Amino acid sequence: MTHNTDLNLPLFERAKALIPGGVNSPVRAFRAVGGTPRFITRAQGAYMWDANGQRFIDYIGSWGPMILGHGHPAVLEAVQKAALEGFSFGAPTEREVELAEEIIRHVPSMEMIRLVSSGTEAGMSAIRLARGATRRNKIIKFNGCYHGHADSLLVKAGSGLATFGHATSAGVPQEVVQHTLVLEYNDVAQLEEAFTLHGPDVACVIMEPIAGNMNFVRASVPFMRRARELCTQHGALLVIDEVMTGFRVALGGAQSLYAQAIPGFKPDITVLGKVIGGGMPLAAFGGSRAVMEQLAPLGPVYQAGTLSGNPVATACGLATLREIAKPGFYDALGARTRALIDGLAGAASAAGVPFCGDTQGGMFGFFLLPQLPQNYPEVLNTDGMRFNTLFHGLLDGGVYIAPALYEAGFVSAAHTEQDIADTVAVARDVFQKL
């Protein structure tokens, strides 16, 4: 069913009168690309439908969690069964234990795990744990990496390595971020100098192994290796934020890929979210037993949550993880994702539009640039106006990618070869108009 008038617009007007910006997470407002956000009414498989009844091939996947696609039968069955048993108990359940066992089976660096309700909560708790375990205050993060909206992580770089960061949000006191040092991603020399200047005071280094809020930028193997070496040398903890990459790029997360290139590699703390909840509010952080036993009720680092380990969310996550652990899942997912980027690259090339892209598992990114950027300043060279035109052309053609230049995209197991072909066909027409 389609409509002659846009039903998304009056919904957006209603929302703006009640909700700041009309949305409950800023990127959904289409401020970066312009226009009216689509109000989604339902989703199934690889598709979403908006208030007008227009169908979209979905490459957002709820910003990553929907690795099986929307409405997978096994997940629906698990969620329905759990909901009938009770929405929330505020007490331990066997399913929490089963989910922890499933995660730890595939991510062996996580000897113990704590379930929470959001990636922000997991990242915030990981930082507190690192500080409590090391009895140090300073943290190192990287320009362009996003770890949730916790105060100490909403930081931009200072004027040099001797200075600490400045808050990127109103409401965050400078005193909160004064212990956060922001460096350029993939810059080994900066990282070494930072440890030379501040090593004894650094509690942790936190990084995304693939920076999905720079669209798609990988940590180089030398950079990751040196981060691990410097943390070990100075007694700091290496925190790998796999909220986006965990179970999305490989069954063992991105860290399993680095372990293939760096013998013995493992982080001290891992942060997970998105896929482990299968679309429900669920995240986790975990690490070595020695570090995790610093958490209450065993240790002095306090962390708690009313809905942590929610029985319906854990049922959803557990069903999802069991499906993606089946043989051949990631081979098929990775091939489909690669086919998408190769097809888009061919369409751009035929139109003479600069294009480069990268994929890992079911995660992808692309830039309207001749070569892949390695850090945030290089990402900023992308032509934003051209991207906005591309975005709206794809959207009008029934292809839904992230409404922001710097966001990664996601392919699910529900996407078919025909979906990829249809997407490339729409893109081919749009690229010709750029």
From Swiss-Prot:
Cofactor(s) needed by this chain: pyridoxal 5'-phosphate
Enzyme class: isomerase
Membrane-spanning intervals of the chain: none
Keyword Electron transport listed: no
Entry GO MF terms: glutamate-1-semialdehyde 2,1-aminomutase activity; pyridoxal phosphate binding; transaminase activity
Pfam families the UniProt entry points to: Aminotran_3
Modified residues (N6-(pyridoxal phosphate)lysine): K274
Location of this chain's protein in the cell: Cytoplasm
Gene Ontology process terms (BP): protoporphyrinogen IX biosynthetic process
EC number(s) stated in the UniProt entry for this protein: 5.4.3.8
Catalytic activity: (S)-4-amino-5-oxopentanoate = 5-aminolevulinate
Pathway recorded for this protein: Porphyrin-containing compound metabolism; protoporphyrin-IX biosynthesis; 5-aminolevulinate from L-glutamyl-tRNA(Glu): step 2/2
GO cellular component, one term: cytoplasm
InterPro entries noted in UniProt: 4pyrrol_synth_GluAld_NH2Trfase, Aminotrans_3, PyrdxlP-dep_Trfase, PyrdxlP-dep_Trfase_major, PyrdxlP-dep_Trfase_small
Keyword Isomerase carried by entry: yes
Keywords (A to Z) from UniProt: Cytoplasm, Isomerase, Porphyrin biosynthesis, Pyridoxal phosphate
NCBIfam families, alphabetized: hemL, PRK00062.1
Family in the record: Belongs to the class-III pyridoxal-phosphate-dependent aminotransferase family. HemL subfamily.
Subunit note: Homodimer.
Official protein name in the record: Glutamate-1-semialdehyde 2,1-aminomutase
Organism per entry: Acidovorax ebreus (strain TPSY) (Diaphorobacter sp. (strain TPSY))
